[in-house]
Amino acid sequence: MRRNILSSILFLLLIMSVHVAAVEEGLVENEVTFQLREMVLPCPEFSCPTGFVCDTTAQKCRQEVD
């Protein structure tokens, strides 16, 4: 039982360290950036935040595409 708990903890630490290394190297997008890309605001009532443009057809703020 103790061996299973220890190996589970070590496995979780390994996964966390790989994720942290990937985030630091830019291989995994930051969750905040992902949430901003998914942000949909109604244009007429609110102005779009920086990096977003108003899609007049859908009446929603969409991420600006370069």
From Swiss-Prot:
Cysteine pairs bridged by disulfides in the record: C43-C54, C48-C61
Keyword set, alphabetical order: Disulfide bond, Secreted, Signal, Toxin
Cellular compartment(s): Secreted
Entry comment describing in which tissues the protein is expressed: Expressed by the venom gland.
Gene Ontology cellular component annotations, sorted alphabetically: extracellular region
Signal sequence bounds: 1-22
Gene Ontology molecular-function annotations: toxin activity
Sequence similarity: Belongs to the scoloptoxin-04 family.
Protein name, entry field: U-scoloptoxin(04)-Er2a
Organism from which the protein derives: Ethmostigmus rubripes
Classification lineage: Eukaryota, Metazoa, Ecdysozoa, Arthropoda, Myriapoda
